[in-house]
Design a protein with these regions (language model features):
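Residues in the short coil linking paired helices within alpha-helical repeat scaffolds
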Residues: 1, 35-36, 70, 104-107
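Conserved alpha-helical positions within TPR/SEL1-like repeat arrays
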Residues: 21-31, 56-63, 90-96
Length: 172
């Protein structure tokens, strides 16, 4: 029940208004479940204020910013998140690299190479959704949409067969 979940997030934040994990998780809920992007933005900003070095929050907030076309700010956040991600946070690194691959021409080649290495090492992001990013590329009629969608699918499933059949994946 989404209403009960929201009430629980709000109680947790009332109990500790500076807990970056609670603020960031509530922002994810607002973005992914409620589709309340302005409120999610406010929660992400509170979470970053509470802990400016919280790699997961920086990465998640960058998705919202990239999906809504605020690339310059998103690039700043995601490039901050990458060196902060721990060695055990390879899925987070893959997520951040995906956003740069999808939305930043300046970072595309390096991020594509990193994604190839991560996928070859068996790193996946599981059920994490890249749909907001794919929707933006669809809306903009980006010619790389099919490739980026295949990268998202490979990150979710670990199956790189479709991706490996794409010449442009290796031509990065």
């Amino acid at each position: 029940d989404h209403d009960r979940a929201q009430a629980m997030y709000e109680r947790a934040i009332d109990a500790d208004p500076t807990d970056a994990d609670n603020l960031g998780n509530y922002a994810i809920f607002l973005k992914n479940v409620r589709h309340e992007y302005d409120q999610a933005k406010a929660m992400y900003e509170r979470a970053i204020e509470a802990n400016p070095n919280h790699a997961n929050t920086l990465g998640n907030y960058s998705q919202l910013l990239f999906a809504t076309g605020r690339d310059k700010t998103a690039i700043a956040l995601v490039t901050r998140a990458l060196p902060l991600a721990g060695t055990d946070e390879k899925p987070l690194v893959a997520e951040c690299r995906f956003y740069l691959f999808a939305h930043s021409p300046e970072h595309r080649r390096e991020s594509g190479e990193n994604l190839r290495d991560l996928l070859a090492a068996g790193v996946t992001t599981g059920s994490w959704s890249f749909e907001p990013n794919l929707e933006r590329l669809r809306r903009e009629k980006d010619p790389r949409y099919d490739l980026v969608r295949d990268v998202a699918d490979a990150l979710s499933s670990g199956d790189t067969q479709t991706l490996e059949s794409r010449g442009e994946w290796y031509a990065l």
